[in-house]
């Protein structure tokens, strides 16, 4: 086991404070509409240019082990805010830096760190409650666009495209962000349910110009096993042929004789048919088949519930207005499912989202939720170079997280104003002792830090602006983009309540932990001697006459 170095008390805290300040100073340069970029060297390829706080924080690793501990704790603040709300990482970092700096002054003056932390925690709870009281629902497209614009560093085009996407697929719908091929941002929307499985045979194609198979008003057969024997399917194929309607088969697989027979029937025009593999794997495949069944009003043919292909009737089949199959995807448009059943299924999946602890499972469940409740929108980000593309894509993703947070918990006035207004929640707050009162005062001063930093980044005098904003009331604040005072909501400067709340909670949590640190332990890095070189080979005698 490697030897460890231990630092105590003030010397440990001073080292950690240096690390906190190095990381926070790099991150806070990006805050606000006039925040600057940070350029990050990569081990290969061009450097990355970003205004995203968490991207900057993740890249910082300090040489001194004790300073690095402080930096890593603040990095955790940014990550927590990002995980919880998807944005607000820079605000969280600025708050944490201020709490640590103000708090350590109090510790140096002889205050008890544990009571300071309790005071900070009490004040945080009161301010979060006040923030929730200030919050207004984010209902219309205009508000959604404003939130997206602010989060994307005042880029109107990003806010507008996110609002348009949410309008088209609903607030629950899946919106994905991809790299586009042009210079402009583009939005494409897939209506209905789409899953990533294409036709099993190109012979099902009936629209050669677009290379798709299109079925109008089809019946839909859902089977949770492989189909290889055509005899099992004859009864249902005959019934479908009599009904004179197309048929879509969604099964674990269709192979061999069964697939060949379907292709022949389709080409001869006896039954217009197309087959596709069921999406997903294992239990997720069963769940997705059930989703399709609910959406189309059909039943999954499964031996688990006593149904076999031979006994399948038209009543077991689902219905849809149209189905389009391409090489990679299948889209079911306007399924004939009962609305109440679809809503019950949506509620069930929402509960699973709330219960799961796996990020991967949550993402897959949310995709299923969107497919049932609206559709899928794809934002294709346009840019002039690859470096710009990466930077812009990160901003679009941030803005998307922020708008989702705004829809979830509402909005408050932006630009650091909501935190200033929430201070009234701790005007009369008293701790159990004098040290806790100092903890409350520490947070009171820290709350001003985001507004001070926004103003500093825009080149104005922070103290003057903070004083004027404090004298105002309600939504009155300072627009750093135009250097004007006014109603922040009317000026379209909004922050999602969830983002502001998460930033404050993450900052006070980690800030309090740093204040209560009394000892720090780090590994001693030993300088290893350089590896020995190859021994001298000496001259090779007798070679002189070779010239």
Swiss-Prot record:
The cellular location(s) given in this protein's UniProt record come to:
Cytoplasm
Keyword set includes Isomerase: yes
Keywords (alphabetical) are:
ATP-binding, Chaperone, Cytoplasm, Isomerase, Nucleotide-binding
The record's EC number reads 5.6.1.7
| Record: residues binding ATP | 30-33, 51, 87-91, 415, 479-481, 495
A single GO BP term for this record reads: protein refolding
Q: Please tell me which top-level EC class this enzyme sits in.
A: isomerase
Write out the transmembrane intervals: none
MF terms from GO for this chain are:
ATP binding; ATP-dependent protein folding chaperone; isomerase activity; unfolded protein binding
**What domain of life does the UniProt record list for this protein's source?**
Bacteria
Cellular component terms per the entry's GO annotation: cytoplasm
- Keyword Hydrolase annotated: no
Which catalysed reactions does the entry list for this protein? Answer: ATP + H2O + a folded polypeptide = ADP + phosphate + an unfolded polypeptide
What NCBIfam families does the record tag this protein with? Answer: GroEL (TIGR02348), PRK00013.1 (NF000592), PRK12849.1 (NF009487), PRK12850.1 (NF009488), PRK12851.1 (NF009489)
Q: What does this protein do?
A: Together with its co-chaperonin GroES, plays an essential role in assisting protein folding. The GroEL-GroES system forms a nano-cage that allows encapsulation of the non-native substrate proteins and provides a physical environment optimized to promote and accelerate protein folding.
Q: Which family does it belong to?
A: Belongs to the chaperonin (HSP60) family.
Q: How does it assemble?
A: Forms a cylinder of 14 subunits composed of two heptameric rings stacked back-to-back. Interacts with the co-chaperonin GroES.
- Identify this protein by name: Chaperonin GroEL
| Classification of source organism | Bacteria, Pseudomonadati, Pseudomonadota, Gammaproteobacteria, Pseudomonadales
């Amino acid at each position: 086991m490697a030897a460890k170095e231990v630092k105590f008390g003030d010397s440990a805290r001073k080292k950690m404070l240096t690390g906190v300040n190095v990381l926070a100073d790099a991150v806070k340069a990006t805050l606000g509409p006039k925040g600057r970029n940070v350029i990050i060297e990569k081990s290969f390829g061009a450097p990355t240019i970003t205004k995203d706080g968490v991207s900057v924080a993740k890249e910082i690793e300090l040489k001194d082990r004790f300073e690095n501990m402080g930096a890593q704790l603040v990095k955790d603040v940014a990550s927590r805010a990002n995980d919880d709300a998807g944005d607000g990482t820079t605000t969280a970092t600025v708050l944490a830096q201020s709490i640590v700096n103000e708090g350590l002054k109090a510790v140096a003056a002889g205050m008890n760190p544990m009571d300071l932390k309790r005071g900070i925690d009490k004040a945080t709870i009161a301010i979060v409650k006040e923030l929730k009281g200030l919050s207004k629902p984010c209902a219309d497209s205009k508000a959604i666009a404003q939130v997206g614009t602010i989060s994307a560093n005042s880029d109107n085009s990003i806010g507008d495209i996110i609002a348009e996407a949410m309008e088209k697929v609903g607030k629950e719908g899946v919106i994905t962000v991809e790299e586009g091929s042009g210079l402009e941002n583009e939005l494409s929307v897939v209506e209905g349910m789409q899953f990533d499985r294409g036709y099993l045979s190109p012979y099902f194609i009936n629209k050669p110009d677009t290379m798709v198979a299109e079925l109008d008003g089809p019946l839909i057969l859902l089977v949770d096993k492989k189909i290889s024997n055509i005899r099992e399917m004859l009864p249902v194929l005959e019934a479908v042929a009599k009904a004179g309607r197309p048929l879509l088969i969604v099964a674990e697989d269709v192979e061999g004789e069964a697939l060949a027979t379907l292709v022949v029937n389709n080409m001869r025009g006896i039954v217009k048919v197309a087959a596709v593999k069921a999406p997903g794997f294992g239990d997720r495949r069963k769940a997705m088949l059930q989703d399709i069944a609910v959406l189309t009003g059909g039943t999954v043919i499964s031996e688990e519930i006593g149904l076999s292909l031979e006994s399948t009737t038209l009543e077991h089949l689902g219905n849809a207005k149209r189905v389009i199959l391409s090489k990679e995807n299948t889209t079911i448009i306007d399924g004939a499912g009962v609305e109440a059943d679809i809503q019950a299924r949506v509620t069930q999946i929402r509960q699973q989202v709330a219960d799961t602890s796996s990020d991967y499972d949550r993402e897959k469940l949310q995709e299923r939720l969107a497919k049932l409740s609206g559709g899928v929108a794809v934002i294709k980000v346009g840019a002039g170079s690859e470096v710009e593309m990466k930077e812009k894509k990160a901003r679009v993703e941030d803005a998307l997280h922020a708008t989702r947070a705004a829809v979830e918990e509402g909005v408050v006035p932006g630009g650091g104003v909501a935190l200033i207004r929430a201070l009234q929640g701790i005007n009369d707050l008293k701790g159990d002792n004098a040290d806790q009162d100092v903890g409350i005062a520490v947070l009171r001063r820290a709350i001003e830090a985001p507004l001070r930093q926004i103003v500093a980044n825009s080149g104005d005098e922070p103290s003057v602006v903070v004083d004027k904003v404090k004298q105002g009331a309600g939504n009155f604040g300072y627009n750093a983009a135009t250097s004007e005072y006014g109603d922040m909501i009317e000026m379209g400067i909004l922050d999602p309540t969830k983002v502001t709340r998460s930033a404050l909670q993450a900052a006070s949590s980690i800030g309090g932990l740093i204040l209560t640190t009394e000892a720090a332990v780090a590994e001693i890095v030993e300088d290893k001697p350089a590896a020995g070189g190859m021994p001298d080979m000496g001259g090779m005698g007798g070679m002189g006459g070779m010239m």
